[in-house]
């Protein structure tokens, strides 16, 4: 089946016109590829096990672009588009291609199969050919995706930018991809508006709606800050006057520099308390906090975290927000810190700290040794929130994968999905304050009107609890996921060791366990082909795990004091 799907993908992507081209082989690992025909895109054949090729795009004796692609050596796994219409004013393009490795013994790169299969076309087919692509989660149309970036809401539209590799389904060529949605469920890919430049690849960052034109780019301009990943990591700015469709990079980039090696992922927000912008930025094993009047000139205020929380890996992708504590008149601040590795089940995870922030310094209310995790699954990372979300909501998305195996999961046309949207809040339990995580109202609105007892490959399952329970999802192949709630111990666990395909990484098969702060009365379980996300109905527990069953789970077995459940298809 896998071979047939792959064959169809290759055949569809190959529909096009053979290029009017000239290939000049200069050495065993170096060639020039000249393109005279100007269709919309050049279809590049990719083989994931091949060595990386660096391609310099040259026109009129000027280097226009540089990218890295695993050009097919002896088989074609899939195609990616290189859009020629970026260079409409140029009659001829030359691709200066240098392949890593030494190929003297096998005839050199002139024997690569890519030269027989490369061609131009007027369009690139993004029809899904993947068994595991989810139905109600955001995924890239093609290529690799990791961190969500620059998210904002404006004029009824949710804008999601994301770390995107347009030239392969493994990490490389970091660019900001862009998708939009009116309901947080159905997404439309809008292209790659922020691309690498002389300062480096485009790493993670944030966007804000500048309602009062503080930056001088226009009222309601979209202002983005991102990390330029060059020889050193620096922070750069871009702005949009067409509601995020296109961006202009600021002439004064980079606007923030440092000699700290891991210096990245700026997240900014308007702080009404001080009438200024604040920004939080990962700097090694701590978070730096800045303030600004105009989004261009930033003043360092303080650092947080050197002695707090988990330090098993790199700190990155921060967020900082003020929220009400459920059932009280209190307001507190929550600082989000994503860490890799060092998560509770290994690899990537999202930790958080609750406390106070005066616009200058964050003060954590917990002891330094206390670590709080937002989600206890293995596949919840790079969690950040949308700017300008309606009604004061804090709507978050995460990258649904783990750096332990993200490049190896069994998909090729695309890699990675985002979590379902989640609303964040705060609640108290036994004198401590924790983050509540609940599925956003938009996902509930997507339910079918009538529930059933039959599982589908894309559904929500609601289970009423009256105490201990074991819930098993299984299929005819004997593949299963076992979820266990122990009321007395206040724990919930998920066992995916027999869930389906697990052999692509020794780190994948796992049992994940979460604390539950109080009694659970209802579970909400979201299944979408290759993922299972579980929430306590009141937001006291969240767990996100990928699964790759060879057939969809179609059987539910519940043991315990309750057997009441309902299944809603999601549309």
Predicted ranges, named:
Residues 1-22:
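Bacterial Sec-dependent N-terminal signal peptides
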Residues 22-64, 84, 91-104, 124, ...:
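Beta-rich accessory regions
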Residues 23-28, 32, 63-82, 111-149, ...:
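Surface loop/turn signatures of beta-propeller and other carbohydrate-active proteins
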Residues 44, 93-97, 147-167, 189-193, ...:
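Hydrophobic core segments of beta-strands in well-ordered, beta-rich domains
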Residues 48-84, 89, 94-100, 175-182, ...:
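Non-cytosolic beta-sandwich-type ligand-binding/adhesion modules
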Residues 177-181, 236-243, 291-293, 348-359, ...:
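Beta-propeller blade signature
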Residues 323-327, 333, 345-359:
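Acidic, glycine-rich loop-and-beta core segments that form the ion-binding/anion-interacting portion
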